[in-house]
Structures are given as structure tokens and as C-alpha cells.
From Swiss-Prot:
This is Peptide methionine sulfoxide reductase MsrB. Binds 1 zinc ion per subunit. The zinc ion is important for the structural integrity of the protein. Zn(2+) binds at residues 47, 50, 96, 99. The lineage of its organism: Bacteria, Pseudomonadati, Pseudomonadota, Gammaproteobacteria, Pseudomonadales. The keyword Zinc applies. The gene is msrB. Residues 8-130 form the MsrB domain. Keywords: Metal-binding, Oxidoreductase, Zinc.
Amino acid sequence: MQKIDKTLEEWRAMLDPEQYQVCRLKGTERPFTGKYNSEKRAGTYHCICCDLPLFDSNTKFDSGCGWPSFYAPIEDSAMIETRDTSHGMIRTEVTCAQCDAHLGHVFPDGPPPTGLRYCINSVCLDFKPRDGA
């Protein structure tokens, strides 16, 4: 995987303001407002910044948290996990391994088979439906 390295100014020029705030400045969209929170079609979720495939719809589940939730990425190598102690909490941040976009966080309270919940901001994703979906 080839790493993508752009300046913040380059990212700002290619992303809309909300995408830039969340993906590049580690913001968070408000719960239950993201366009993919209730998405049910079959397909693949890609990084909005670099188009790397991140999640398959087969691993998406309704966690009730207000953000799209998945129990596993397509490939473990697509994500980088980092300890996040911001906002007085201890969490694990997940970023895109190809472009370092902030995606969300992973928590150990998901369903089988992994027991993980990848809580991802919709604004960081680009959904590509499977043919016929």
C-alpha cells in the first residue's frame, strides 16, 4: 500500500468543510446525523480521502450508538489503531492506513465473531453499492 502524503491545505481543497474537520482535524459528526448510519444496502465502504476499501456491509450492524458500526475491517492492514486520551476518556482511535484520515474509534463491546465495534463517522466514508443493490 502506497502511503498518501498531502498538506493540510491540499486536503482542505479536496474535502468539504465537514469532511476536513472530521478526517483531518479528528472531529466527530453528531450522532444519528450521518448518511450511512441507517444504510442497509450491500456494498463496500471506502475512505473518503483516498478510496481505500475499509469495511464490507456484511460486517455492519446496528449498535444504537448513532454512527455506522462494523465488527471488522476488510483487512486489518487498512487501519491503524492508536491510543486516544482526549476528552478525559481512554479510547482507541482508528485511522486509514493509507492516508491517515481519522475515521472514528474501536471499542471492545461488539458482536461475535470479533467482539469489536468500529464506530465510524459517515462523513469519512464513501459507500459503493454492489451490483444490483
